[in-house]
């Protein structure tokens, strides 16, 4: 009897947009092509936004054929655009739902202001951190996004901005996922969006990476030479309260350890860190909470950003009264901290801070 080895299924071709630049460079040189072709292809992908290999007209036909044999070229599909215009808004906040090449769904948000157009980008499909006030955490982690998929969000949002005669001026990594659990791809995307070779050419100082406090990666950023800004979701200077709100982040990186990394970051970069503090009624809004927050933040250069709780489906915290928030802010300012109260945009379409969760969680998209 003859036995045959079953054929293993072939791996699906790689989407060219998902390659990091060094991976693209290696693939091109493996084809026997000169290295400058990698730069040309990268510009076709991210500056000209080519949708096919045939469109890359400056490349030799033989190279385009090799690319088509080895790779696919798939762009995200815009599934839905929702708008929210709260009282007094000049322009609507807009949220885009994108479907990626493997079917994963992510959201990104365009936030307008008088002098700025801010793109709020996701770094992961879902999130593993399980913060109790955040809708994204209910999804769990599906996967990291590639640098190309991060860039595609910026491209899509800039298209909306261009409809109003504007362009993106600022980027915040405050969408779905924890950026510092996908640091390599986030940094690769930042390198592209801040490069002079590409259309937007954003200043790195206009880009903010927001984290729950992944200490080893904060230390990595402090050594990286990046000029981006850092925001840290703190939400309580009491370890036991922070563990209730952010169980994974607080347990892995307790407040004293996080403080040391922020102090080192501030000294290494000379930059003030933004401490993000979501005020929750009866949880972290007392005078003692304000006192502990001020004491905690004395160890590093920072500004404090107070934000309102935005309701999500799974857990109902209470919002803080305006008078209570004003007292909290006044105390911190009396302690010589720069304190701002962030205005929430997009709550009516679940686009505000902590509300991003793909529509797959609310209804099925066919």
Curated annotation (Swiss-Prot):
Q: Which cysteines are joined by disulfide bonds?
A: 120-353
Binding of [4Fe-4S] cluster occurs at: 127, 131, 134
This protein's source sits in the domain of life called Bacteria
For S-adenosyl-L-methionine, which residues are the binding ones?
Answer: 177-178, 210, 233-235, 310
Catalysed conversion reaction: adenosine(2503) in 23S rRNA + 2 reduced [2Fe-2S]-[ferredoxin] + 2 S-adenosyl-L-methionine = 2-methyladenosine(2503) in 23S rRNA + 5'-deoxyadenosine + L-methionine + 2 oxidized [2Fe-2S]-[ferredoxin] + S-adenosyl-L-homocysteine; adenosine(37) in tRNA + 2 reduced [2Fe-2S]-[ferredoxin] + 2 S-adenosyl-L-methionine = 2-methyladenosine(37) in tRNA + 5'-deoxyadenosine + L-methionine + 2 oxidized [2Fe-2S]-[ferredoxin] + S-adenosyl-L-homocysteine
MF terms (GO), sorted A to Z: 4 iron, 4 sulfur cluster binding; metal ion binding; rRNA (adenine(2503)-C2-)-methyltransferase activity; rRNA binding; tRNA (adenine(37)-C2)-methyltransferase activity; tRNA binding
Q: What is its main location?
A: cytoplasm
Query: Could you name the Gene Ontology cellular component terms for this entry?
Result: cytoplasm
Q: Which Pfam families match?
A: Radical_SAM, RlmN_N
Identify which cofactors the protein needs according to its UniProt entry.
[4Fe-4S] cluster
Keyword set for this entry? 4Fe-4S, Cytoplasm, Disulfide bond, Iron, Iron-sulfur, Metal-binding, Methyltransferase, rRNA processing, S-adenosyl-L-methionine, Transferase, tRNA processing
Q: Per its UniProt entry, what is the enzyme's top EC class, as one word?
A: transferase
CDD domains assigned: Radical_SAM
Q: Where found, per UniProt?
A: Cytoplasm
**This enzyme's EC code(s):** 2.1.1.192
Cofactor binding note: Binds 1 [4Fe-4S] cluster. The cluster is coordinated with 3 cysteines and an exchangeable S-adenosyl-L-methionine.
Radical SAM core domain mapped to chain residues: 113-342
The UniProt entry, under InterPro entries, shows: Aldolase_TIM, Methyltransferase_A, RlmN_N, RNA_MTrfase_RlmN, rRNA_lsu_MTrfase_RlmN/Cfr, rSAM
Instruction: Cite a single GO BP annotation.
Output: rRNA base methylation
Residues annotated as catalytic:
107, 353
The similarity annotation says: Belongs to the radical SAM superfamily. RlmN family.
Q: What does this protein do?
A: Specifically methylates position 2 of adenine 2503 in 23S rRNA and position 2 of adenine 37 in tRNAs.
**Other notes:** Reaction proceeds by a ping-pong mechanism involving intermediate methylation of a conserved cysteine residue.
Give the NCBIfam families listed for this entry. rRNA_mod_RlmN (TIGR00048)
Q: Any idea what this protein is called? A: Probable dual-specificity RNA methyltransferase RlmN
- Taxonomic source organism: Chlorobium chlorochromatii (strain CaD3)
Q: Which gene name does the record give?
A: rlmN
